[in-house]
């Protein structure tokens, strides 16, 4: 799919032009409703940027906006004409790409950690999760939320695949919501992982119905959790993003992000160890491990048809300020990935 453009990447993946000045905190491709591929990235430098991705792998910077604080999440409107941007300034802004205008559409009492578009047959809204311990649902034409749900703790991660939403909170809380008619709590449980979770992603079954989620923790481990497991053994955890050090001890790194392939249903994890790995959860096997980057991988995502995998390389502060090297700049890479993520054939 991609032609030969220059790259400094050891795997010859394609480097995105004009990346942010600080680590990437959010990375989302445009939805399938848009003919071309656009990529949006939010960063700790308080910017959100948009690129057009061409067929040969080249990226064309289209626009950039600066928010009132570090960006923690982004999501696209269902028609691909707008981008919602959640920030540490306690607001969510709507960025209209055609007019290049920005307006506030949501607010919390603390930094907004997650934003997701909910598109059901009877309503469309924006779901926002915050460190103020609330989950809010917004009709973006109105200044007040349609609904506010109090969470037991701060929202750390979330995902939406209609009619399901899932929220991971501080203190290892996991809450599943049904979005049919209106958002209602369906199930609440403690995380199967012993350590703080950082990433969550919903997966679908063969009928394309959302049936569970993958949850990643700072302890190099992922849990595959079905909402209603046919067999308790369907739920399992696996180790990842670990290396055996010279002394024989294991170095354990955080799972920073998880994404499911939109066609194959296989998944990718990215970590503080500077690698990504492709997995087949049904065969319970690893499909591929990447080379190790010289910094952590902070975020990742697939484009709508599953041809392109994007991942962001940058420091995630997992080793504290003494390991921060200002000479190492953030980078975003694109990889042609469709065949590599095909499920294992038994």
Swiss-Prot record:
GO terms for molecular function: RNA binding; ubiquitin binding. It comes from the Eukaryota. Keywords: Cell cycle, Cell division, Chromosome, Cytoplasm, Differentiation, Meiosis, Mitosis, Nucleus, Repeat, Spermatogenesis, Transport, WD repeat. WD repeats lie at residues 17-61, 64-105, 126-148, 255-289. Its main location: cytoplasm. Head (at protein level). Disruption phenotype: Larval lethal. Larvae die at the third-instar stage. RNAi-mediated knockdown in the testes results in male sterility likely due to defects in primary spermatocyte nuclear integrity, meiotic chromosome condensation, segregation, and spindle morphology. These defects lead to a failure to complete meiosis but several aspects of spermatid differentiation can still proceed, including axoneme formation and elongation. RNAi-mediated knockdown in the developing wing or in the proliferating cells of the developing eye, reduces their organ size. Belongs to the WD repeat rae1 family. Probable component of the nuclear pore complex (NPC) which regulates the nuclear export of specific mRNAs and promotes cell cycle progression during mitosis and male meiosis. Acts with Nup98-96 to promote the nuclear export of specific mRNAs such as Moe, however it does not appear to be required for general nuclear mRNA transport. Essential mitotic and male meiotic cell cycle regulator with roles in many aspects of the cell cycle including chromatin organization and condensation, spindle assembly, chromosome segregation, and maintaining nuclear structure. This is Protein Rae1. It comes from Drosophila melanogaster (Fruit fly). The gene is Rae1.
